[in-house]
Each structure stands twice: as C-alpha cells, then as structure tokens.
Amino acid sequence: MEYVPKILVDADACPVKAEIKQVAEQFQLEVIFVASFNHYSVNTNGENWIFVDTGKESADMRMMNIANKGDIIVTQDIGLASILLAKGTYVFSNRGELYREEEMSLMLDIRYRHAKERQQGKYSKGPKAMSDQDRSLFKDRITTFLQNK
C-alpha cells in the first residue's frame, strides 16, 4: 500500500491555517497542527491538534518525531526546515516557498548573521504582514505542488 502523506503545520505563528485546511480537504490529506500549550484552545473544530509544552524547541521536536518521508511541512523556521528536508519531507514557508536542501546552508548562514546583528543592536525589519494576495499565492503554490506530485 502506498504511503499517503500528511500535512504537518508549525502552528504557533502560522498565518495560513485556513488555506492549509482548504487544500487538505481538496486533496483529502490529514492535517496535524503542532503548537505549544500557550496556544491551547478547547475549540479545535474537529481538527487534529497536538499541543506540546512551552519549551523552546518542543514543537520542533514533536514535528521531527512524527514527520515521515513524503510528508508536507509548513513552517517559517529555517532550522526546522533543514532538519525535516533531510528526512525526505517537502517543506513550505508560510508564503508558499518550497525550501530546497541545496539552499539551506546559505539560508542558515543568513539567519545566523541576522541574529548576530540583532545582538549588536542592529535591528532589521521583520517580514512584511501577510496580505490576501500572499495567502492566495501560498494556496496556489501548495495546490500546484500537490497536483504535480
């Protein structure tokens, strides 16, 4: 029997949960949202949520433990993305960018340099706010990926 991938979502700060649910319904894929207890809600609307303790890497560790080759991951955490790519998963950013292993070294280096600059008091602007166009682009990209898979 062929493995049916699931969608794992690093849900603490994910702005495209609704779009992920729509795509999952369209392709009949299971979605698992992983978040810290800080984001706990009794109203999960029948969705599959896993809540973990509030430790720094708790959600990341849980995602690493339940991800399988072929699964689709949505995260904006580049460190987590690099680890999950090595497991043979497909990792998307919240903006629909499909991460690639060959880009990870450079992306991790840039993240490190930005962290050093912030420590030195050189603050850069964060990412721009998500627009409806960004949400639509995310949905289009992940839909196209699944159609071609």
From Swiss-Prot:
Pfam family, one: DUF188
Signal peptide positions on this chain: none
InterPro entries linked: UPF0178
Top-level taxon of origin: Bacteria
Similarity section: Belongs to the UPF0178 family.
HAMAP family with a match to the protein in the record: UPF0178
This protein's name: UPF0178 protein lwe1471
